């Protein structure tokens, strides 16, 4: 059960003390307090952990400071979409809103190469009105002999250039606790010119200790990709690890499943789960068409597979697109064959916008018929 307190509740007040004293007297019930501090208000939630079936919602709602009460199911307790759940399905970071009603495009380099490539990519994004990007500094690879990223050496110039070209958020994968500290230090040294969304890749979806560590910090939001060899339920519970440790600013990423049933694409496209994840949880849903398709193959109509798939999923309500571009794919250190060209960026963005408008029209249509 979750007690949602009135906004800006003073935790030093007598009424709050009265509430906590009452909760402390509940046998077999433990409490966990979570606070979200926004620009205009502070929101406090108290999680009651244990056998709460005997607790009456009306009685709990009548307690001091309590504005609403949510009875949660066993699964996805924090991030789940429960009955009569008024909690928001969005969050803001660095002035960018991430929610189940928004769409953000994160185009960029799968792996950071030289500084010129980074600058060319970021300049193109700025010139096309974008404020988010992807930049891979740490690259987990299947082969121990493959390039594994420039690591902390590239962070200063990536962050400096991101600030120069107005990037508000960079999606960046980490694979170890030390990477989190390196990102913090590099941001501090460069004057924090941009923000970072930490990315947990498919290989680390069940690295539970890493999930706990990332979940305990709340300065960076998290993009968690679905594990490529596990069920959707297992991946959603991985996201719950993050949230249960305190970080609720989580985006769930679909990137295709590893199976030969996806041939000739790199992975089997699992984007039909976009509406499923939105129905089960309050997380925004990201799709990664580049790592699903893995090639620049085109249909007879001339449209690239990666663009067809992106459009299909945006029309189904996806909230974030993580896509590979590169100024010179032949020189890319990772995944060059699947990267789109910088000159294709305006075309890609316009195609995404067409798909988004189609989705909004579909929602409008549903609402109109629901009223009739």
Cite the ranges covered by each PLM segment.
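Non-catalytic terminal accessory/regulatory regions of metabolic enzymes
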Residues: 1-106
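Glycine-rich, proline-tolerant flexible connector loops at the mouths of alpha/beta enzymes
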Residues: 134-153, 325-336
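Hydrophobic faces of well-ordered beta-strands that scaffold small-molecule active sites
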Residues: 103-109, 131-135, 169-172, 196-200, ...
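Catalytic alpha/beta core domains of metabolic enzymes, predominantly
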Residues: 93, 206-325
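Alpha-helix-loop-beta-strand connector modules within alpha/beta enzyme cores
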Residues: 147-172, 214-221, 271-287, 338-359
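N-terminal small/glycine-rich loop or linker at the start of catalytic domains
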Residues: 91-110, 141, 282-295
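Active-site mouth loops of central-metabolism enzymes
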Residues: 103-120, 143-149, 169-174, 199-202, ...
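N-terminal active-site wall of soluble small-molecule enzyme domains
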Residues: 140-195, 207-209
């Amino acid at each position: 059960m979750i007690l949602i307190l009135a906004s800006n509740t003073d935790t030093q007040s007598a009424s709050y003390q009265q509430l906590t004293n009452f909760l402390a007297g509940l046998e077999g019930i433990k409490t966990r307090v979570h606070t979200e501090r926004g620009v205009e208000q502070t929101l406090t939630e108290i999680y009651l952990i244990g056998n709460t079936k005997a607790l009456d919602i009306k009685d709990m709602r009548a307690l001091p400071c309590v504005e609403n009460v949510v009875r949660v199911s066993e699964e996805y307790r924090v991030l789940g979409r429960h009955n009569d759940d008024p909690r928001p399905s969005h969050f803001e970071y660095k002035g960018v809103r991430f929610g189940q009603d928004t769409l953000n495009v994160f185009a960029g380099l799968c792996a950071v190469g030289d500084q010129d490539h980074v600058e060319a990519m970021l300049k193109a994004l700025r010139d096309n009105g974008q404020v988010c990007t992807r930049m891979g500094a740490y690259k987990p690879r299947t082969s121990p002999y493959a390039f594994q990223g420039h690591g902390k050496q590239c962070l200063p110039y990536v962050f400096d250039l991101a600030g120069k070209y107005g990037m508000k958020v960079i999606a960046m994968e980490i694979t170890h606790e030390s990477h989190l500290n390196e990102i913090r230090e590099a941001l501090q040294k460069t004057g924090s010119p941009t923000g970072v969304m930490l990315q947990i890749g498919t290989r680390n979806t069940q690295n539970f200790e890493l999930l706990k560590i990332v979940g305990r910090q709340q300065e960076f939001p998290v993009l968690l990709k679905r594990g490529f060899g596990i069920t959707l339920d297992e991946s959603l519970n991985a996201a719950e690890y993050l949230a249960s440790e305190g970080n609720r600013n989580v985006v769930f990423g679909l990137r295709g499943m590893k199976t030969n049933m996806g041939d000739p694409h790199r992975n089997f496209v699992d984007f039909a789960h976009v509406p499923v994840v939105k129905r089960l949880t309050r997380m925004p849903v990201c799709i990664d068409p580049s790592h699903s398709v893995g090639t620049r193959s085109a249909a007879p109509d001339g449209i690239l597979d990666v663009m067809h798939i992106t459009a299909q999923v945006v029309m189904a309500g996806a909230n974030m697109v993580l896509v590979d571009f590169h100024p010179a794919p032949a020189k890319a250190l990772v995944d060059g064959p699947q990267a789109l060209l910088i000159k294709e960026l305006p075309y890609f963005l316009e195609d995404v916008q067409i798909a988004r408008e189609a989705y909004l029209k579909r929602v409008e249509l549903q609402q109109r018929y629901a009223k009739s």
